[in-house]
């Protein structure tokens, strides 16, 4: 009996050390930090995750909302095997599941945006035994019109440059075409003038010859 106690103690200590060395399992959440959308349109709130554990029926997803002007946190959406929409509140009939857990995507769709939808949307994923980790946050701004971002300005600049190049090419081609046409017209006029002068000279020669015969 006493001979087994040291062995158990060693195994217990070894187990504690292995537990301390084993990395803590945590779910990593990925969301766009800032999102801008136009009033009255629909928007996709993207949320993806990574987990050490395989995705199964134990996976749960919780979406909540914190208004920008303050107030209590509000329920938006819940997923566990099947999606559960809110039965009441501001998001009733305005939210839909648009995720695919097998692809680590737990995004949702928010329809008919309103200005009071401004605020922070949180995405929390638990995939036992991975239950720890930070909660994803999206700062949504509902605006009247979307402001131009750097990407929009870059696309506009590239489009304008391409349009300018096309216009320059068209102008050069037209210029060369009209230039060749004018040269051809000038050459044709020169030929006509020369032919008229030659014809006039021939007529004068004929007239002089006829005068010589009459003399």
From Swiss-Prot:
A GO biological-process term: cell-cell adhesion
Intracellular or extracellular location(s): Membrane
Principal cellular location given in the protein's record: membrane
Signal peptide stretch: 1-26
UniProt entry tagged with the keyword Ubl conjugation: no
GO cellular component terms given for this protein: plasma membrane
Residue ranges annotated for the Ig-like V-type domain, each copy included: 27-141
Cytoplasmic side: 176-215
Any Pfam family hit: V-set
CDD domains: IgV_EVA1
Database matches in Gene3D superfamilies: Immunoglobulins (2.60.40.10)
Its membrane topology: Single-pass type I membrane protein
Keywords, in A-Z order: Cell adhesion, Disulfide bond, Glycoprotein, Immunoglobulin domain, Membrane, Signal, Transmembrane, Transmembrane helix
Disulfide bridge map: 47-123
Transmembrane segments: 155-175
Residues on Extracellular side: 27-154
Sugar-bearing residue positions: 39, 118
PANTHER family per the UniProt record, alphabetical: MYELIN P0 RELATED, MYELIN PROTEIN ZERO-LIKE PROTEIN 2
Family, per entry: Belongs to the myelin P0 protein family.
Function: Mediates homophilic cell-cell adhesion.
Protein name as annotated: Myelin protein zero-like protein 2
Biological source species: Bos taurus (Bovine)
Source species taxonomy: Eukaryota, Metazoa, Chordata, Craniata, Vertebrata
